[in-house]
Curated annotation (Swiss-Prot):
Gene Ontology cellular-component terms listed: plasma membrane
Protein name according to UniProt: Large-conductance mechanosensitive channel
PROSITE patterns noted in UniProt: MSCL
Complexes and interactors: Homopentamer.
Stored PANTHER family: LARGE-CONDUCTANCE MECHANOSENSITIVE CHANNEL, MECHANOSENSITIVE CHANNEL MSCL
Cellular location(s): Cell inner membrane
Top-rank taxon: Bacteria
Length: 144
């Protein structure tokens, strides 16, 4: 099998395609969250604090001299990015909680629940996982 055929086989596997779709959707979701923070949350927060625009928060480390621009640390934009991260992290947390709750309502077990019950990292009692575990922990390992 040639290199290009191997690459095509790799690229067309379900996991790679799913990962690509997830990254694209994640990037679009990140833009939505950034817009929400910059255009909805931060202006309201600034209004509550007293009409402050967080994007303008900065420290001048070295003032401008002639044609040389000032050296400025814009920590207001950093604060906005922290809010972006918190909102994305919260959204991901809520989605994972929803998925886990739906799995438990259907009577299915999540991978983490199975791993916890087994007391080891052999997921779903798959023989391949057991072989991997034996290789990791030594030949004397048994699955009782």
């Amino acid at each position: 099998m040639s290199f290009l055929q191997k690459f095509r086989k790799f690229a067309m596997r379900g996991n790679v395609v799913d990962l690509a779709v997830g990254i694209i959707i994640g990037a679009a979701f990140g833009k939505i969250v950034s817009s929400l923070v910059a255009n909805v949350i931060m202006p309201q927060l600034g209004l509550l604090i007293g009409g402050i625009d967080f994007k303008q928060f900065s420290w001048v480390l070295k003032p401008a001299q002639g044609d040389t621009p000032a050296v400025v640390m814009k920590y207001g934009i950093f604060l906005q990015n922290i809010f972006d991260f918190i909102i994305v992290a919260f959204a991901v947390f809520c989605i994972i909680k929803l998925i886990n709750r739906n799995a438990s309502q259907r009577g299915g077990k999540t991978r983490r629940a199975v791993q916890t019950e087994c007391g080891r990292d052999a997921a779903y009692r798959d023989p391949r996982s057991l072989e991997t575990t034996k290789q990791r922990h030594g030949a004397g390992y048994n699955d009782d």
